[in-house]
């Protein structure tokens, strides 16, 4: 048995220790180097990046909404203004139990089921950490009640905002329009137009009328403030502020009192009236009835209220003055006369015998005159005074649809008028091409005949009727109807500028005076179809009435409004201007199905007297309904 070596090799152990210590030291040195390198990267290389991130957590940019421009009438009366409202808002991510919080708020701020439904709808389309309205238009009592109980509702606060308000309600809805909450379509459009950033602090946008058309002018430029916040998100101090730029105030050509007066006259009727100054094209009144209160839409209309408007058989949502399309009827006869004279189809001396009907050559088809026993021998002026259909059947036949549609297009029919409202329809000025495309059928000669009296396939809006009337008054010089009078910029009024358009025909032909003389005869001469309404006026009026058929009669039938359903009765129309020798006002009017009140001539006289005399109680002769119906041609 060998003896165990009890001696240790201290030299070897020492060398091993040194090697291990060296490895450990090198490891520590390497790790320290990595740490120093990383620290250098964080503190030196990426200092700016991390400083920015830190500031973003500490410093916030808060957008500041601009004040929306005020809309005034021509006399400086505010038609759309801003007022401060308070609303309660919630950031759901800061609330432990949203439903319990909503339930608790019911008794504090009188929260309703509709309010909660609107909140949930808005929450569904909002981003996280967005403050969402719970209830708007808080009363002073509700604000005070919440202030006392605010400690119970973390994540909920009351904020003040400027809200649009329309003090005259339904009287101006179809002109002024309204603003309402920005929706997804608005966001998409603003983003595509590069304007979304300017709406960072804005809840509303123009949806209709002037508010929509002049949105860029009225909105202004969003400002912002740079604030420092603590770790709870509360503002500690303001670092910088760039104030918002308020939107521009605008002044309209409208006369509020005239607008309200006409709306009162049309109460209960489906009707439209456009009043213009033919010297400038400025719209003095644009009324469409029935209407509705635009304030309903500002904070978001309830589904119940919107459904009621949408399903109303009287269609209050439609602006009849610019979107209602009707056969223009006999109101176009003066323009057809000027066109036929200008085209050489007729002359000043052309005459025609009217037996009460006109027969299409080579056919047994007869077209009846509204006066079944006829008007006898007619020239151009008398055919306008008595509104002979037969005379204009012949004119339409001789002109043909190509020339007729071309000339009426020059008067603006079938085209947008250029009025500063997005809600406009162009109507229809029929052509061969239109019929082929629409019905896959050729144009027949018989289609042309009713076009000569503003019937058939021809449809137009009251604003188009107004523009055509101004062209006639100005002897072919075109005035675009407009609502904007001026814009307030830097303390100055910048006026709206009438665009230049080529004149219609020869402004020195004398044909314009011939047509206007015919309209003068309508209102003033014994054989004029509307003389009983206007002959007694202390100023001179020129007018032209029209009847647009809704329900077709058989050859042996006679029209009787009392035996026809109300919706099938004829539309009554009239255009007029005054004073005759120096026109200052032009009016176009339509009463759907004849209206619910006085005759169209009575209403026209009342409007003109109100403007020319300031007389709101025009004394007119008693009306015989049967005679009135016959005279409204």
What are these regions (language model features)?
Residues 1-303, 325, 347-348, 353, ...:
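Periplasmic/cell-envelope proteins involved in peptidoglycan metabolism and beta-lactam response
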Residues 2-11, 80, 229-239, 279-331, ...:
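Beta-lactam-recognizing serine transpeptidase/beta-lactamase-like catalytic domain environment
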